[in-house]
Amino acid sequence: MKVLALRHSVAQVYADTQIYTHDETKDDYENAFLISNLTTHNILYLNYSVKTLQILNKSGIAAVEIQKMDELFTLIRCNFTYDYIDDIVYLHDYSYYTNNEIRTDQHWVTKTNIEDYLLPGWKLMYVGYNGNDTRGHYNFSFKCQNAATDDDAIIEYIYSNELDFQNFILKKIKERMTTSLPIARLSNRVFRDKLFKTLVSDHSRVVNVGPRNESMFTFLDHPSIKQFSNGPYLVKDTIKLKQERWLGKRLSQFDIGQYKNMLNVLTTLYQYYDMYHEKPIIYMVGSAPSYWIHDVKQYSDLKFETWDPLDTPYSDLHHKELFYASDVTKLKDNSILYVDIRTDRENADWKTWRKIVEEQTANNLNIAYKYLSTGKAKVCCVKMTAMDLELPISAKLLHHPTTEIRSEFYLIMDIWDSKNTKRFIPKGVLYSYINNTITENVFIQQPFKLRTLRNEYVVALYALSNDFNNREDVVKLVNNQKNALITVRINNTFKDEPKVGFKDIYDWTFLPTDFETNESIITSYDGCLGMFGLSISLASKPTGNNHLFILSGTNKYFKLDQFANHMSISRRSHQIRFSESATSYSGYIFRDLSNNNFNLIGTNVENSVSGHVYNALIYYRYNYSFDLKRWIYLHSTNKASIEGGRYYEHAPIELIYACRSAREFAKLQDDLTVLRYSNEIENYINKVYSITYADDPNYFIGIKFKNIPYEYDVKVPHLTFGVLNISDSMVPDVVAILKKFKNELFRMDVTTSYTYMLSDEIYVANVSGVLSTYFKLYNAFYKEQITFGQSRMFIPHITLSFSNKRVVRIGSTRLNIDFIYLRKIKGDTVFDMTE
């Protein structure tokens, strides 16, 4: 949902939009809670409170102040990610298709012939890093830029088996127009940038597990971050290959040679970062014009020095000349060298050209060895061709996508590699590598071992759920890693499947109860965003590709109502109750009936079950930003930090009742996952709360009324307001609590409206209006370790007779309290009080 804050109402009516006017009788937290549970996507918030907007944004719900109609129109028609700290709106708006254009934020694409293969009459637009160049389109009171681009489709095309780009991009545009927006992918780049800047400033050692190409710009400015990936393809790994011949295959209609060069250099750069944790000088020989340097400089202040007879406009220092082996002495330590020398074929015949290529390959390799033979802190990436070669066994092979697969590949070496054992590699083996291997990632660092790191902050986004990881080891890492942000795939199957298929792999599935964490926040993507200064206009949908975000070591853990809080907890319930169910009271009715409470009069205002816990369980697929386990734990230890709101602390027994209702719901829905989740949450409640039951009571609290509107034959009809199992020495403690609650007890609006047979020969009258106070009293006794209440649900009633009687219904009648007392069962009254 998105909340657009206005000072005045607007005349225009918008689809899927609701107006909420700030309620001055409620505080900011209560207003935020009410807004978050509205069911429409767009909320126009009138007479708004800035504090309420802050609360919503911290909860991951985008809430933006609107000053002009243009702002309203722009934000209401598309989704966005909002940086509420720096007041920047990142639109995810593809309406630019109506201008017959596709967009890119990679400058090199604009220097290709891609426009020859676009849809007729279409053009390509460059919009800068995260759409930064579009800011001029929006003259708003907040910074605004459109971060939506088609780079995902362009890159997918490059790695696909499709050659016809026009057909491919047409299909992708149609897909985008007919399926829900993958907003997490769009928003993720904004999130990653913010996340790692924050972590690097707060932690001296940060580890990142499983980065992919979409992060290749994110980490350019963070050389200290240790990366773990799937490891490199080494020269020695070619021993498994059979020999093949030249294949020759076109991968792309438009020229992607610059993209290949960029990937080669960035792969080399991240190898350098992995070894030396600082920024090097980047030397490049050949590969002009290297327009992609402009893209790199949008993210980092890396320095480039280049050699090529052709211009390289974005180089910091360009030498418009050839580079020779003798020039290696000009290169400094703490650097990387990219050697991409290859002359044009022009009119040379094949044999002559092949001889030139092999000579240049040998020359390139000689330059690389000479560069690595002296000095320190050096890594080299060199252009090679398939030919009989001796190569260091530990050198890394690269074959990033290029326009045509021919005979070229690349080799990365560091100083140690260059001096390592060499192995003869036949030309046919190298052709086999080229023909069958595409390097898919610029991150080729070693795989992560699932073990706790003592002094590091571990980030593992979408990296650990794969079933090639041992599931128990993943759980152990989450439980024991002190500082971390780890994601795992949430189990939102209905059959409690332990793993699910995704693309061509399988992922383990998890529930929050799979982890034993006491100082970690377990939330959703949008819940996590709120903790890093971001919010989003479109909440996660239960697509099957959803993840739990687990934050360990965060200073926000105790701020229960500020982050990963109960905002939107009833939203799915409201959507169902007011559109699909038998009655808008269905949830209240079901919760009472499933706990054998058949008095449904006033069930919507006097319910014996925690609605928060019930909704968090049965609708967890729709809203798991609310960290239920943390909410339970902090209340059980009395450590919850509550900033505001009409906050009601549930008695532990109300939580138990909610689990039982959710379990009943799951059985009716044949939802095995909710069934397990409900059982495990109930077990967790029993673990963190020391709940004892007065199933063999020796005292009870009684309430005698001045008027009973029914016939009765018991000596003193009364309401048993709970039973206790206590020693006589604890009586003063019980009395002290009763005295503390005196005013609230006598203020109860107690009513009755019918009689019924509680069981055979037990004739009783119903009592309404006491449950809220009963559970508050329960909590007070629990905190003093006084056993109060039974394991079965408390159903307030007045016993009228121990014989079978005819049921009577009357109008709702108020019962006036005469006095309240504490009495020993089969004994004397030890305390009483009157108003």
UniProtKB/Swiss-Prot annotation:
The keyword Transferase applies. Transmembrane segments: none annotated. Pfam families: Rotavirus_VP3 (PF06929). The keyword Transmembrane does not apply. Residues 693-835 are annotated as: 2'-5'-phosphodiesterase activity. It comes from the Viruses. It is found in: Virion. GO terms for molecular function: GTP binding; hydrolase activity; mRNA 5'-cap (guanine-N7-)-methyltransferase activity; mRNA guanylyltransferase activity; RNA binding. It catalyses: a 5'-end diphospho-ribonucleoside in mRNA + GTP + H(+) = a 5'-end (5'-triphosphoguanosine)-ribonucleoside in mRNA + diphosphate; a 5'-end (5'-triphosphoguanosine)-ribonucleoside in mRNA + S-adenosyl-L-methionine = a 5'-end (N(7)-methyl 5'-triphosphoguanosine)-ribonucleoside in mRNA + S-adenosyl-L-homocysteine; 5'-triphosphoadenylyl-(2'->5')-adenylyl-(2'->5')-adenosine + 2 H2O = 2 AMP + ATP + 2 H(+). Residues 246-428 are annotated as: 2'-O-methyltransferase activity. PROSITE patterns: SAM_MT56_VP3. Its EC number is 3.1.4.-, 2.7.7.50, 2.1.1.56. The active site is at residues 718, 720, 797, 799. Contains a bipartite N7-methyltransferase domain, a 2'-O-methyltransferase domain and a GTase/RTPase domain. The C-terminus contains a phosphodiesterase domain that degrades the 5'-triphosphorylated, 2'-5' linked adenylate oligomers produced by the host cell in response to IFN stimulation. This is Protein VP3. It comes from Rotavirus A (strain RVA/Cow/United States/NCDV-Lincoln/1969/G6P6[1]).
